[in-house]
Amino acid sequence: MPLPPQRLAQAPDAPAISELMHASVLDLFPHFYDERQTASSAVYIAHLDMQLIEDRTYFVHEADGEIVACGGWSKRNKLYTGSGALGDDARLLDPATEPARVRAMFVRGDWTRRGLGRAILEACERAARAEGFKKLVLGATLPGEPLYRAFGFREIKRFTLIMPDGVSVEAVAMERPIEPLRGGNADSRSAAMDTA
């Protein structure tokens, strides 16, 4: 079965993306976290950062007019929504010395394990490479960890996210080098297709 089309997210997609994030957490987190952790994550992790859409670094997959997967990358300092509002969150990263961030990956429960997460990660890698980045980092919740490992991310450390309501959620800091292009410039053509 072919993947549903991927495109860059736009501001009018925000309500549908937020709904998908919330539903994905409620669907998938109970397999990894308890009821309190799932409920807290639905409030504080399933939160769309509009800066990703404004920066044109956030992708969606649509099937039958509905967004079924979303995720992206950032060239800014903020690593994840739950990281709080630090003074330098919006700072642009230096691609020569700092890694790009993979951000806010969510797949609707009935669309998991069909390649959508991988397709978004591939789009993120192409776009970050085109901007000169050499590495990707992310803060994974436990439901996403298997996808990231399968894509070649390695664990840096395990850590605890403390939500604003005091609930703690186990997470994993991960990284992956961005592979250099081998021959031709197919990557720039692929990146151009992602933005169409």
Residue ranges of predicted features:
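Small/polar loops that bind or transfer phosphate-bearing groups
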Residues: 9, 103, 139-140
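Conserved acetyl-CoA pyrophosphate-binding loop and the N-cap/start of the following alpha-helix
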Residues: 111, 115-123
